[in-house]
Amino acid sequence: MSLSKKISVVSKEYVFQFVIITILFALWGIANDLTTPMVSTFKKVMPELTNVQASLVQFAFYFGYFFMALPAALFIRKYSYKSGIIVGLILYATGAFLFYPAAHYQSYNFFLVSLWVITCGLAFLETTSNPLILFLGNKETATQRLNLAQAFNPIGAITGLVMAQFLVIKEIKSDDYSTEAFNALSSTELASIRENDLGIISIPYIGLGLFVLVILVIICLTKMPKTAHEDKMSIGESFKKLLANRNYKHGVIAQAFYVGAQIMCWTFIFQYVDNINKTFGLELTATYYNIGAMLLFLSGRWVGTALMKNTNPSKILMYFGFGGVFCAAGAIVFQGIPGLISLISISIFMSIMFPTIYGIALKDMADEAKIGSAGLVMAIVGGALMPVLQGSILDWGGSGFSDVQILGFIPEVNFSFILPLICLAVVTHYGYATYKLSVKQKKTKNILVTE
């Protein structure tokens, strides 16, 4: 550990490039969390949607990662990291601009396609940016460096939530009526409200698309560093080496479960708060609590990154995993404000999981890292599948959130967080297993040095 203290997290010659690439981490955070509240927003604007249908927003959004991650890895393998970033930004902007015709035609499926195109772009950006960050300094500080870059992702996430709250949720007219009053409106009035609200939903995405174009120009004018090595392995050899790497394979599984947990906790907090409001007669604003969760997430990321200076990353992952499981259990069992506090507290412990799993899984890799990073980005498909499963639990007794009481006292919306709990337990086990392995390897190394 004394060695890591003497090594700078980012090499001096790459500081500017590190800053530019870090902006991309915030940029996909904006898209992620601008979209998260859209599940409940589309449900209000299009009340004919079931909870499962509304959750297809997240399915379409995160399925793009699975679909495009491997092609992105093959693309940057053939060309360059910079080329991958440029393609990613072009797709990002294109998907954002597609919101305009989607709103014009009032097509839910068109919106889903637009979101899918955005995440095809994000798949390029994440597949490119994450491994590139690892190369911008000494490998001893690679995981710490990635955590530092990822610490700016929740800043983007908070920005996305603020945009969603003040540019969309507060402006849509569908939310101004009670269910009874809304159903009593004439077909002409309903059509007018829907046209207005879908137009409002499209505005922040179109603005985001314009901002992405500005970043695209900056990236085109920025000289990016070449990676520390050229691709010497064939694609087949890379796959063979990855499939033989048990640590990597388990890392992909852990990443899929982590992303599923994160998206479920940040998506269904809106339904969780709605149920509290209806049950206890409160008027809580879900977005504010989601922003609070983001702030806790950001704080946890910075604290976790600092802890890694002197503590094994796998050990931190294990302990943070335990904390997440404990809070998820509280979100299930407790009702009202205590349950809500437990739910947002999960974000503290999720904060370091994505970059830490990423860094551990790719540790000591060489040529196969580009393909390996694609597998970890494809694992984000967990964010596409899990919310649909959670939405199906909410539909057990009808369109409400407490139609069914589990064990006689747990509303179905609370019980649905059993899925994030299971996901976080899987991540905890990965942290435990890799920590045990690292301790064993360290002992073996010390014995060899002694001999």
Name each model-derived stretch:
Residues 108-125, 338-353:
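Hydrophobic core of transmembrane alpha-helices in multi-pass small-molecule transporters
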Residues 55-76, 291-303:
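Central cavity-lining transmembrane alpha-helices of secondary-active solute carriers
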Residues 35-39, 160-172, 241-291:
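Extracytoplasmic gate region of multi-pass secondary transporters
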Residues 124-138, 351-366:
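Intracellular juxtamembrane helix-capping segments at the cytosolic ends
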Residues 122, 141-173, 374-387:
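Glycine-rich segments within core transmembrane alpha-helices of 12-TM secondary carriers
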Residues 90-105, 322-336:
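C-terminal ends and interior cores of transmembrane alpha-helices
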Residues 2, 6, 11, 20, ...:
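Multi-pass alpha-helical transporter architecture, strongest
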